[in-house]
Regions:
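Helix N-cap/beta->alpha junction signal
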Residues: 13, 64, 127-128
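Short, structured active-site "lid" loops
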Residues: 50-78
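Paired acidic/hydrophobic, glycine-rich loop segments that form the ligand-binding mouth/hinge
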Residues: 72, 77-82, 161-166
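A conserved helix-loop-strand patch within extracytoplasmic ligand-binding domains
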Residues: 83-86, 90-141
Length: 292
């Protein structure tokens, strides 16, 4: 195929997804490639519109399957995903050829800070990981479900309470002024891959692979690979209470078991056998909490 062809980049149509995909497209065009966006409706978006809690949907890839399918069936050449939404199981015929430079991986409270939250205050979040982490430091807090796009979530801050969001999502849309408190990522360990975008293409598409090599950030790729190795060893999806965050020479991990037992680890990463260390940590953490 011609190297002059237009690279069609599939993405969800939410404001955050559009902005993230547009940044990837801009990087490709700056490098001399022609690019256009292809918007795809996903199961996750449909359930979000219906207000269905994410952890009740079942299955994995609810925000990614339809976007990947657009590439596999030829409607697009590339697929852009929030990396935290991308399952660790590979899809035949596709591979991640770029991890974009990571934004902040932290979570943040919007509304009141932890210190400002009165006893029994309400936190709105759809993430079981965030609920488990906040409950560990404030067992008095109440939790209610929260889904929707960023604008919708910001309209649903409980009276006297807070919502929890990824700092990166607010950065993308220029809304960091709404943050009451950024949470320490060594205690409130972020979701795997939080803060970066994964871009897939077909494994036999040499033009797309070459184009994406200029978008890939090696440091982010290394960090997310370690985090995903931890998650893959657990056999877990994004709807379960798991976090992993690599920064510097440490992989920070969080796991909550079915009985409420919590395991936290800081694994030194010295440059050798790094993926093996992440996998070993996952096995030890799972044994510590007694399984799901």
């Amino acid at each position: 195929m011609s190297v002059d062809r237009v690279l069609r980049l599939a993405t969800r149509s939410s404001p955050q997804a559009r902005t993230q995909a547009s940044a990837v497209a801009d990087a490709l065009m700056t490098a001399g490639h022609r690019c256009e966006l292809v918007f795809v409706d996903t199961e996750g978006d449909r359930s979000q519109s219906a207000g269905t809690p994410l952890h009740t949907i079942g299955g994995r890839g609810v925000f990614t399957k339809e976007v990947q399918r657009a590439v596999l069936d030829g409607r697009a050449d590339l697929a852009a995903h929030s990396a935290k939404d991308l399952p660790t199981e590979p899809v035949d015929g596709l591979a991640v050829s770029a991890w974009t430079k990571r934004r902040s991986a932290r979570d943040a409270l919007i509304g009141r800070s932890l210190a400002e939250l009165a006893p029994g205050a309400t936190i709105a979040t759809g993430s079981v990981r965030r609920r488990a982490q906040l409950s560990a430091v404030r067992d008095d807090l109440r939790f209610v479900e929260l889904r929707g796009n960023i604008g919708t979530r910001l309209e649903r801050i409980p009276k006297g309470g807070s919502i929890v969001m990824a700092v990166a999502a607010l950065e993308v849309l220029g809304m960091t002024d709404r943050i009451a408190e950024e949470l320490d990522p060594t205690e409130f360990v972020p979701a795997v891959g939080q803060g970066c975008v994964a871009v897939e293409c077909r494994t036999d598409d040499e033009v797309a692979i070459a184009a994406l090599s200029g978008v890939n950030d090696p440091m982010t790729a290394r960090s997310v690979t370690l985090e995903r190795a931890f998650l893959a060893e657990l056999g877990s999806g994004c709807s379960l209470p798991v976090g992993a965050h690599h920064v510097g020479d440490v992989l920070w991990t969080f796991l909550a078991g079915a009985g409420g037992t919590i395991d936290r680890r800081s694994i030194p990463i010295d440059g050798s056998a790094t993926v093996d260390a992440a996998r070993a940590a996952a096995r030890a953490a799972l044994e510590s909490v007694g399984g799901w």
